[in-house]
Amino acid sequence: MSINTVYYQIAKDVTAADLAKIIGATDLYGPDQIVINDIESFDAAKPFSLIYQSDPELAKTLAGESAVVITNQACLPLIDPANCCLIVASPRIGFAHALAHLVTAAPVDHGTTGVSPMAEIADTATIHPSATIMPQVVIGAGTVVEAGVILHAGVKVGEDCYIRSNSVLSHCLIGNGGDIGAGSVLGAAGFGFEMTDDGVVKLPHIGLVVIDDFVSIGSGCAIDRGSLGNTHIGAHVMMDNLCHIAHNVTIGARSIIAGQCGVSGSVTVGEGVVMGGQVGIAQHVKIGDGAVLTARSGVTKDIEDGDQVA
């Protein structure tokens, strides 16, 4: 992904050499005058972007050149010298410190009450008087926004949606025909941090939540935005009450998720998957198309297409 300028802005004219000093890099290798103009995940690296990597097996897959890579000594020999490498003990912590310096929220008036005059709202949309609609929000035709809803700056809601009472949406793109249940929170930062001797280092989340057309989200659900990429919910997904979808998750189209399910970070769920109540899925797991996870299943490894887990 690239930095979304509706939500974020990146510091200008920061070179690799500048950043090495900021994050306390022990060594720097390669072209140190590269000016950083974007943030990317490692697998989407492009020239002049900042990325990080701590796994030597993945480090050797880097394609391209002129990126700035926060990494460690183990990965260094595997990265093309046309990139600039900043060496730190913990690349993930170094990356967190780098983002804290480079990326800031785009300026917006968060003191808005009622409907901001800078919001774009279709004439046929219905907005409850107690709802808060911040600047740069877009609401499509026929959409209903109920009492107590808060739509933070930059949120986009398609046509014929229901955003039900007291839900809070930020860093979200919602397609047409969506139904967001009462009290749900979409687009908050995910549960990403590193524990150090000096305390907790929180990892910035600069991604979004992207929800396709005709998705139903139950009451009291939480869907966290992505850390670098997006959290993505496919079309026609049905999600029951009290579910948690963590950062960077992808849920395939037409999947059904019963109440109290928890999906950990960076999980990929295929199309047409069925999850019974209280299913828990561990991070980075892949669930194949059409798989069935029966109630209270704990999934810690990949599941093939069409398999059933009890």
PLM ranges: what are they?
Residues 165-310:
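Glycine-rich hexapeptide-repeat left-handed beta-helix
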Residues 43-45, 62, 78, 118, ...:
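Generic structural signal for beta-strand residues in well-ordered domains
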Residues 1-118, 177, 183-184, 189-202, ...:
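Terminal amphipathic alpha-helical/low-complexity segments used for targeting or macromolecular assembly
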Residues 1-3, 24-40, 144-154, 169-173, ...:
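Short, charge-rich amphipathic segments
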